[in-house]
Amino acid sequence: IASGSHDWENRLENNIWTYTLEDIWSGLQDSYQNLVNDVKEKYDITLTKVGSIGFSAMMHGYMAFDKDGELLVPFRTWRNTMTEQAAKELTELFRFNMPQRWSGAHLYQAILNKEEHVKDIDFITTLAGYVHWKLTGEKVLGVGDASGMFPIDSTTRNWNKEMLAKFDELVAPKGYPWKVEDILPKVLVAGEKAGTLTEEGAKLLDPTGKLQAGIPVCPPEGDAGTGM
């Protein structure tokens, strides 16, 4: 057993609680390097490969990307209470509680605010989903983390189709080029194949180039939800 860590703190910018992409990657790289150092110190082994990897991170919030994979607006974390109108309207529409912090509430609030970026959305995800995507190329999310984006059908263990349809009907007059299911990650449950670490992903985690690609990665999950 070995460990590595990194301390970070969110920042308030333009009245939005956020982390930059640089914060995310520098923090992950620092944690990984500290893990490598711990393995070397304890066992005199240079870490190049592990049996499997999993990511868990803060749930909810809003990370929206265009078709080129570019972040459209700064990451809006779960701490933001800026979606009151959207949360209220969706709760009434779905007859299901949609808290302000959920990604669906953030998306609908951006629509209500007539934010320019909404028409360009190709993919929305959580922090764990973002990291997993960049390291594996897979746009997937564990069902636990997914349940903090949009309502889940507990029978199918997938997005609630009825509520997806209601959302699409609600925003149809806006004429966006997407349906909501098309921009959400694919939902997976524990044990399902979620991809492997790519060459690019390995270099993102370990810029020294020692970490090998091909390591299986489990579905990304919410707070402390992965591999525990």
What are the residue ranges of the model-derived segments?
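Short hydrophobic alpha-helix segments
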Residues: 2-6, 75
